[in-house]
Amino acid sequence: MRKLLCAVLLVALFAASASAWTVGTLSRMNATEEEYSDRNPLAYASGAEGLIQSIVLGDGLSGEGKPSFKFYDSLTMMQMALNRGEVDVIITPDFVGEYMLRNNPDCSLRVFVLLKRPITLALGFLEEKAELCKRFNEALKTLTENGMTSHLARYYIAGPEAQNPKPVSIEKFEGAETVNILVTGDIPPLDYVDAGGMPAGYNTALLAEIGRLLHVNINLVSGEAGARAAALKSGRVDAVLWVEVMPEGEAQFDKPEGVVVTMPYYGWNKVFMISMKKK
């Protein structure tokens, strides 16, 4: 496993009362905080129940400390909440957690890795744009079969570009159809916006390849994670990125009714729980 910041895996994440502890996560398109807390997605993590109760809540407790989830509309807001103690821990995909750790040189964060069943990401469209979704799906199929999605993942997520992704040039085609797609920058380096407000990273590079295959103009529209559903339903954008698709049979917290999705374009099976180090 890749070396984590300061070569430390968390031995004791956080001591809290047995009655409640709060977990920060990015807003989902198809769930309220209450619904998310009731389902407790952390229960899907392999062996998580005992591990979380002993590591996060402290040993010798009753085991009734079910987490309460709090949604944040952006990664920045979620990090600020962790810094000021509004939440006990935050959860992120492994690649986001590693990005945060690399960009936290003072080593003030601690992490524990949970194994989950695979979670995948897809592009989401309204049902009335199902034909457009189908075209994007065919492009993704081609890019998967020819190895391009794997190549981009190695370069932008696992490679040196993950530290500070550069903006990607997206080819424009005169007179061609324009497809507006929301980019949030809230799950770097997969979905990333640089300090100057320019989208970059894996998603941008992937969209450039899709635009080239389909001969369409990709227009990137900036917005926060919490704005994805509203932007899609209002028609501000034609598609949103990183719709989180859970394994079959599990609750779909991020896929509202009336939304269709492409085949997966990225996936992972590790979740990072991150807390602040005690002073």
Enumerate the language-model features and the residues they cover.
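Disordered inhibitory propeptide/activation segment of secreted metzincin zinc metalloprotease zymogens
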Residues: 151-181
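Flexible hinge/capping segments at coil-to-helix
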Residues: 32-41, 263, 274-279
